[in-house]
UniProtKB/Swiss-Prot annotation:
Belongs to the heat shock protein 70 family. SUPFAM superfamilies: Actin-like ATPase domain (SSF53067), Heat shock protein 70kD (HSP70), C-terminal subdomain (SSF100934), Heat shock protein 70kD (HSP70), peptide-binding domain (SSF100920). The modification Phosphothreonine is found at residue 175. It comes from the Bacteria. Induction: By heat shock. The gene is dnaK. InterPro entries: ATPase_NBD, Chaperone_DnaK, Heat_shock_70_CS, HSP70_C_sf, HSP70_peptide-bd_sf, Hsp_70_fam. Residues 578-615 are annotated as: Disordered. Keywords: ATP-binding, Chaperone, Nucleotide-binding, Phosphoprotein, Stress response. This is Chaperone protein DnaK.
């Protein structure tokens, strides 16, 4: 059996590792380095360069050099090179092919399978795009695992006889994740995760670039950011300065002949101190603190419960980052793992678990965001809450919103808001062929299934007819990094507003339900209801009908209560007169959350589908 490699497909650098003799080993690339720049370049002669050689010539070939493609994964954006458009998956596949070739040269055999890591906060389409990139590169991706989780495997493989709670702080080139894990008896259990898929070392570089450009503009009146070649030189100088300031308090930025004007060539020669760098990037560092707080809160832990802090990603070498983590946690971060290599090592360990080379290790990861469906009134009804251990499967029974409704459209949403419109729609599908029946009678079972890769499948089944429909969520390409972060932030900011909206919709749904029950009861009881009682209940129903579609929630509540009591009074009278055990009609005190048929499933919730008017 051929080896299964572990790959850290990073924004700025990538790394590959493999299990050998029971221990993980990082594989050096063809240039002798243990990490490979995630850079692809296209030459005039059609040649394609990947890695360090591509990065070296990026200054002279900026238009055809692609960097940080990971930030585009899962989007519909394409990169235009000459007369061809490349998807992010295709560019990522070129990087994976380079890593695969280096691994094959090292192992002396063909490699066809891999475990690839992704940021913990990657959404479904980004994970699927990563799998697709692997497939394009000729790799069967056995598992997609989260980067902080992989890092914890690298940290904890030799500590499996201890019980520890670990906080993994992962600040890479383009993404930031924080995960809280519990390690004990060989089980690596993720308790929670949080992060920002658009925060990383690139943003620190950009702060330096902007500072240099602004200083140059002040002195020379020229904005270097309008010159692609100059901009690429600025980026390279900014990255170099950032790295040097991790070990020294001052660095010199020297860029001769950066541009020219009528007076002659222009040069940059300036010093940048660590203090100035810290000032420029203070906001970025502070942006990493809130996700730590949220992750701890979601895990139900305080910072005092954490035994170890593990720093992952090259950007954690920045002294201000280390200081911020230490100040918040009150603990010195562990130095036991290499921040550039530990994610790939963890991926290799997971590969060993899958092949049986590594024994007695169990990895339990989580889904980062809540998944649910849109129900009547535009409410987002959750089926799988965020930070649920995966793989997982959850079913819930829903019903129809109209009599004889032939089909339902199921809108799958992802996010933390109470209203579906405020979350991201991942996809829609339709269940047809529902047997004609009154509203609320059909039982539509919706099932969410998240596999160990975090990829979602959704199915819907009419329990009456057995008719079934399903969808694998692969088209959620418009869910941007900002939208994911905004989903959680908005959920907190508008929590009360969302709660109020949902309560108001439930009040209106209850009003609709009691009107429906009243009409049904009057029809079923017929002449058994006296003219006086019928007139009274019709008046109360009319009063509710006038207000139920308005915005006066208190008026709707009062009118609903009045009609409920009137209906209860006549049905009680009918029971007393007939002595029957089960008069026709429904008990209005059951509320809208119960079905009128006695055999309602306990798993039925107070939520109906929208009518699919196109059917």
């Amino acid at each position: 059996m051929s080896k299964v490699i572990g790959i850290d497909l990073g924004t700025t650098n990538s790394c590959v590792a493999v299990m050998e003799g029971g221990d993980p080993a990082v594989i050096a690339n063809s240039e002798g380095a243990r990490t490979t720049p995630s850079v692809v370049s296209f030459q005039k002669n059609g040649e394609r360069l990947v890695g360090q050689v591509a990065k070296r010539q990026s200054i002279t070939n900026p238009d055809k050099t692609i960097i940080s493609i990971k930030r585009k994964m899962g989007t519909a954006e394409k990169v235009a090179i000459d007369d061809k458009n490349y998807t992010p998956q295709e560019i990522s596949a070129m990087i994976l092919q380079k890593l695969k070739a280096d691994a094959e040269a090292y192992l002396g055999e063909t490699v066809t399978q891999a475990v690839i890591t992704v940021p913990a906060y990657f959404n479904d389409s980004q994970r699927q795009a990563t799998k697709d990139a692997g497939k394009i590169a000729g790799l069967e991706v056995l598992r997609i695992i989260n980067e902080p989780t992989a890092a914890s495997l690298a940290y904890g493989l030799d500590k499996m006889d201890t019980n520890q709670k670990i906080l993994v702080y992962d600040l890479g080139g383009g993404t930031f994740d924080v995960s809280v894990l519990e390690l004990g008896d060989g089980v690596f259990e993720v308790k929670s995760t949080n992060g920002n898929t658009h925060l990383g070392g690139d943003d620190f570089d950009e702060k330096i670039m902007d500072y240099i450009a602004e200083e140059f503009k002040k002195d020379n009146g020229i904005d270097l950011r309008n010159d692609k070649m100059a901009l690429q030189r600025l980026k390279e100088a900014a990255e170099k300065a950032k790295i040097e300031l991790s070990s020294s308090t001052q660095t010199n930025i020297n860029l001769p002949f950066i541009t020219a004007d009528a007076t002659g060539p222009k040069h940059i020669d300036m010093n940048l101190t660590r203090a100035k760098f810290n000032e420029l990037t203070e906001g970025l560092v502070q942006d990493t603190i809130e996700p730590m707080k949220k992750a701890l809160s979601d895990a139900g832990l305080s910072i005092n419960d954490i035994d170890k802090i593990v720093l992952v990603g090259g950007s954690t070498r920045i002294p201000a980052v280390q200081e911020a983590v230490k100040n918040y946690t009150g603990k010195d971060p562990s130095k036991g793992v290499n921040p550039d290599e530990c994610v790939a090592i963890g991926a290799a360990i997971q590969a060993g678990v899958l092949t049986g080379d590594v024994k007695d290790v169990l990895l339990l990861d989580v889904s980062p965001l809540t998944l649910g469906i849109e129900t009547l009134g535009g409410v987002a009804t959750p089926l799988i809450e965020r930070n649920t251990t995966i793989p997982t499967r959850k079913s819930q029974v829903f019903s129809t919103a109209a009599d004889n409704q032939p089909s339902v459209e199921i809108n799958i949403v992802q996010g933390e808001r109470k209203m579906a419109a405020d979350n991201k729609s991942l996809g829609r599908f339709t269940l047809d062929g529902i047997a004609p029946a009154p509203r609320g009678v059909p039982q539509i079972e919706v099932t969410f299934d998240i596999d160990a890769n975090g990829i979602v499948n959704v199915s819907a089944k009419d329990k009456g007819t057995g008719k079934e429909s399903h969808i694998t969520i692969t088209a959620s390409t418009n869910l941007s990094d900002e939208e994911i972060d905004k989903a959680v932030k908005d959920a907190e900011k508008f929590a009360e507003e969302d709660k109020k909206k949902k309560e108001n919709i439930e009040v209106k749904n209850n009003a609709d339900q009691i009107v429906f029950q009243t009409d049904k009861a009057l029809k079923d009881l017929g002449d058994k209801v006296s003219a006086e009682d019928k007139s009274n209940i019709e008046a109360k129903k009319e009063a509710l009908s006038k207000v139920k579609d308005g915005d006066d929630i208190e008026a709707i509540k009062k009118a609903t209560e009045d009609l409920t009591q009137a209906l209860y009074a006549i049905t009680t009278k009918m029971y007393e007169q007939s002595g029957a055990q089960g008069a026709p009609g429904a008990d209005p005190n059951a509320g809208a959350s119960q079905k009128t048929n006695g055999g309602a499933d306990d798993n039925v919730v107070d939520a109906d589908f929208k009518v699919d008017n196109d059917k």
